[in-house]
Amino acid sequence: MFDATTILAYKGKNRAVIGGDGQVTFGNSVLKGNATKIRTLYNGKILAGFAGSTADAFNLFDMFEEFLEAKKGDILKSVVEFSKAWRKDKVLRRLEAMMIVLNSEHIFILTGNGDVVEPEDGEIASIGSGGNFAISAARALKKHSSLDEEALVRESLSIAADLCIYTNHNIKVLSLDGEKK
């Protein structure tokens, strides 16, 4: 349930970008090929994407946005407080979804058991069944190409879609322009 998609986020020098494929699967059947699994939060200042149960993910998006509002858009404080709530709440602990959230300064993976993980390099994160393919491609393209952030995310997701049966080529990308502080 956690794996049937691919979400990739890249916090580059000029832009923060998140992308995801559009495939929705149920067991071994494709139910939909053009779903949107990424969105902007907090008046377009935060990017987020999910892998896992769609209904659970929408609940998590809404709850996380409440924390962003309460913390006035401070992504670091919001993920910490959200994680605490996730771990304490019996209903939240049963949700089957993971999220990536990022802005121009930070990128985090929020896991299904309430953990918050900041990627080691602080720049690239992925979740879902094609996540390892996408992050491998993104790291290689970052190191050996001159692609801009959006093109790097699109190409990495395309490579993941070539390899992962739960990921398709209907790729959607969102970005935040802006300099890092």
Curated annotation (Swiss-Prot):
Indicate whether Lipid biosynthesis appears among the record's keywords. no
Assembly, per entry: A double ring-shaped homohexamer of HslV is capped on each side by a ring-shaped HslU homohexamer. The assembly of the HslU/HslV complex is dependent on binding of ATP.
One of the GO BP terms on file: proteolysis involved in protein catabolic process
- Gene3D superfamilies, alphabetized: Glutamine Phosphoribosylpyrophosphate, subunit 1, domain 1 (3.60.20.10)
- Family (UniProt): Belongs to the peptidase T1B family. HslV subfamily.
Q: Name one GO cellular component term.
A: proteasome core complex
Instruction: Write out the annotated subcellular location.
Output: Cytoplasm
Per its database record, what is this protein's job? Protease subunit of a proteasome-like degradation complex believed to be a general protein degrading machinery.
Q: Specify the enzyme's EC class, one word.
A: hydrolase
- EC id: 3.4.25.2
Q: Which PROSITE patterns match?
A: PROTEASOME_BETA_2
Q: Does the keyword Cell membrane apply?
A: no
Per UniProt, activity regulation is: Allosterically activated by HslU binding.
Q: What's its catalytic activity? A: ATP-dependent cleavage of peptide bonds with broad specificity
Residues binding Na(+) are A161, C164, T167
Give the residues annotated as active site: T5
This protein's name: ATP-dependent protease subunit HslV
SUPFAM superfamilies assigned to the protein according to its UniProt record, in alphabetical order: N-terminal nucleophile aminohydrolases (Ntn hydrolases)
Known NCBIfam families for this protein? ATP_dep_HslV, PRK05456.1
Keywords, comma-separated and alphabetical = Allosteric enzyme, Cytoplasm, Hydrolase, Metal-binding, Protease, Sodium, Threonine protease
What species was this sequence derived from?
Answer: Sulfurimonas denitrificans (strain ATCC 33889 / DSM 1251)
Molecular-function annotations in GO: metal ion binding; threonine-type endopeptidase activity
